[in-house]
Regions:
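Short His-centered aromatic/hydrophobic patch
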Residues: 64-67, 85-91, 109
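A short, well-ordered alpha-helix in the C-terminal region of glycosyltransferases
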Residues: 310-323
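A conserved mid-protein helix/loop that constitutes part of the nucleotide-sugar donor-binding site
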Residues: 13-24, 172-195, 208-214, 295
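A conserved nucleotide-sugar
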Residues: 30-33, 171, 186-227, 309
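Donor nucleotide-sugar binding/catalytic pocket of nucleotide-sugar-dependent glycosyltransferases
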Residues: 122-158
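Short hydrophobic beta-strand element within catalytic cores of glycosyltransferases
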Residues: 36-37, 267-271, 280
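Conserved acidic donor-binding segment of nucleotide-sugar-dependent glycosyltransferases
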Residues: 282-283, 287-294, 301-307
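Aromatic "clamp/platform" in nucleotide-sugar-dependent glycosyltransferases that forms part
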Residues: 231, 250
Length: 331
């Protein structure tokens, strides 16, 4: 079986990171594959160094003749059995169906998208049951909608030395990961820090809200206890150094960072947004708080200590191993 994967994603993002992990896992499983991506040099290096045959295209929003022509040539000459397009732009860029075509077009959703971008697909994949229910509710045939979760790396690493980031070794350390975007609600996490005078926060990510978040930290008087780390590919040392992973998102289709925390044996507290409610079993493998409620978030954070923290981390690891490990997803 020949598989062509097409990803027109941004420079940074959870879906983009999982795309790379899945492509490398397929390569290790000896899947005959080829990928087409935007020309981000670091992503091409990640894929090529893992042995993945990689083509790059611009994937512009409109009138991108070169990308369309290039994809048509790959499909015509390489003749894949399956074309897996990631999210809306790649799905829209895939050559339109033709009578007698000899590949199956599968679209992978990264959120609650409009179905108009996926009209050329034969099947759709959602990474949560709720996403599958969503597309079926819009009229997509249930027999052509499939649930396939993500997986993350289980690689452990020694903790990043807190001294490097001028963080006390004995302070309770919170970790936030993701794009600095309104949907991620890191402003709520910063507000909660005002109720947590002994806690420190490492915030790893980039995005349009970075300047506003930095200003907010100063306004709240917590800037000395908050470290903005930028986008980090080496998250394992961050997890090893942290005490709690906080995911305060207002909107979160899945929550890759929760899976990463589970795989790294770190307890999780998250806002009860749609995908996170489906992922987390409250008081078992994590804690859920109302979205946008900084005092409630702070109160729950203060309650994750000692044996309770250890129990949440252990249950999270068990959930990851049961349903979200590489072997289960790839097979």
């Amino acid at each position: 079986m020949k598989l062509l994967q097409v990803m027109a994603g941004a420079r940074y993002g959870g879906a983009e990171e999982f795309f790379v992990r899945l492509a490398l896992a397929f390569e290790r499983a000896n899947v005959d594959q080829r990928v087409a991506v935007r020309g981000h040099p670091f992503r091409k290096k990640q894929l090529s160094s893992g042995g993945v045959r990689t083509d790059t295209f611009a994937f512009r929003r409109w009138l991108d003749v070169r990308t369309n022509f290039g994809l048509r040539n790959i499909i015509r000459d390489w003749r894949p059995d399956i074309v897996l397009t990631w999210m809306s732009r790649a799905s829209r860029a895939c050559p339109k169906p033709k009578l007698g075509r000899d590949f199956v077009h599968v679209g992978r959703l990264g959120g609650y998208y409009k179905l108009k971008y996926f009209r050329g697909c034969d099947h759709l994949i959602g990474n949560t049951p709720g996403m599958v229910d969503y597309v079926c509710g819009l009229g997509w045939p249930a027999e052509c909608a499939h649930y396939l979760p993500n997986f993350v790396s289980e690689r452990r690493a020694p903790p990043l030395d807190r001294k490097i980031l001028n963080t006390p070794g004995d302070a309770p350390l919170l970790l936030g990961l993701g794009r600095l975007h309104e949907n991620k609600a890191f402003d709520v996490l910063l507000d909660s820090m005002a109720f947590l005078p002994d806690h420190w926060l490492w915030l790893a990510g980039t995005g349009p809200q970075e300047a506003a978040l930095r200003s907010q930290a100063v306004r709240l008087g917590i800037e000395k206890r908050v470290r903005f780390l930028g986008w980090r590919d080496d998250v394992a040392p961050l997890f090893s150094a942290a005490n709690i992973l906080v995911c305060p998102s207002r909107s979160e289709p899945l929550g890759n960072v929760v899976l990463e925390a589970w795989a790294q044996h770190v307890p999780v507290i998250a806002a009860a947004s749609e995908g996170l409610q489906q992922l987390i079993d409250h008081e078992v493998n994590g804690l859920l708080v109302p979205t946008g409620d900084a005092p409630a978030l702070a109160k729950s954070i203060m309650g994750i200590t000692g044996a309770r923290a250890e129990a949440l981390a252990a249950s999270g690891w068990a959930s990851y191993r049961e349903s979200y490990n590489e072997g289960t997803v790839v097979s």
